[in-house]
């Protein structure tokens, strides 16, 4: 079994040993446009990519450009790790640690730093508000 995934742009990315130099916005956008929310348990195909457009909600609330971009990136780790249903994910602490580490790396790459505690709270509010939109 391979230790890496070949991304849309042809890079060999190791999800267990992520390298920020191999993270490409094109890979994130492409993969998230093809991953279905809710493990496919939705009435019609609804991609993670469509869900992250909750950035519109951040803009409507008058949040900063940084928070709008954070909304676009908040599920970016799923392009490398897939989407694990929340009830199951709660039972996988090591997965959560790896996902958080990768997401932190993505935020640092595209935002310049990780999210502050206040920004994380704002993001969760928007994510929950847009859960089914």
Please provide the spans of the model-predicted regions.
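Metal-dependent phosphohydrolase cores
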Residues: 1-133
């Amino acid at each position: 079994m391979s230790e890496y995934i070949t991304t849309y742009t042809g890079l060999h990315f190791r999800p267990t040993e992520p390298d920020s130099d191999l993270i490409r916005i094109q890979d994130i956008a492409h993969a998230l446009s093809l991953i279905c929310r809710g493990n496919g348990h939705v009435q019609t195909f609804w991609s993670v990519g469509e869900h992250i457009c909750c950035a519109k909600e951040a803009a409507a609330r008058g949040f900063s450009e940084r928070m709008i971009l954070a909304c676009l990136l908040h599920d970016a780790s799923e392009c490398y790790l897939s989407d694990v249903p929340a009830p199951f994910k709660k039972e996988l602490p090591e997965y959560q640690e790896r996902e958080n580490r990768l997401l932190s790396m993505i935020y640092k790459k595209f935002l310049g730093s990780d999210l502050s505690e206040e920004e994380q709270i704002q993001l969760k509010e928007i994510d929950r508000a847009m859960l089914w939109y």
